[in-house]
Amino acid sequence: MKSVFVESTIFEKYRDEYLSDEEYRLFQAELMLNPKLGDVIQGTGGLRKIRVASKGKGKRGGSRIIYYFLDEKRRFYLLTIYGKNEMSDLNANQRKQLMAFMEAWRNEQS
């Protein structure tokens, strides 16, 4: 079944800093095989955080991607990407902002 990857402007802006084109393709293939990889972020309505290897670093020291999977449409909404060394977890305000952004985006796409 075909999947669609929708990138936020933030994800699009920073992706090249963290992932090579090949690493990005591998990440997409991994998500298509197992769309619910990563941990659900509590209090966000289903957003997930996944560890990815980035630019020669392993998954543990690599990057984190926040995404949402809309199952009925096989859409992956890629919201943001950041290095593990930059931030460990999202704070309450960031979670709230991402959830609001995702809700608006999802309503726009339906």
Swiss-Prot record:
It comes from Vibrio cholerae serotype O1 (strain ATCC 39315 / El Tor Inaba N16961). Induction: Induced by amino acid starvation and the protein synthesis inhibitor chloramphenicol. Keywords: Toxin-antitoxin system. Pfam families: RelE (PF06296). Toxic component of a type II toxin-antitoxin (TA) system. Inhibits translation by cleavage of mRNA. HigB-2/HigA-2 has been shown to stabilize plasmids very efficiently in E.coli. Three hours of ectopic expression of higB-2 results in bacteriostasis without any detectable loss of viability. It comes from the Bacteria. This is Toxin HigB-2.
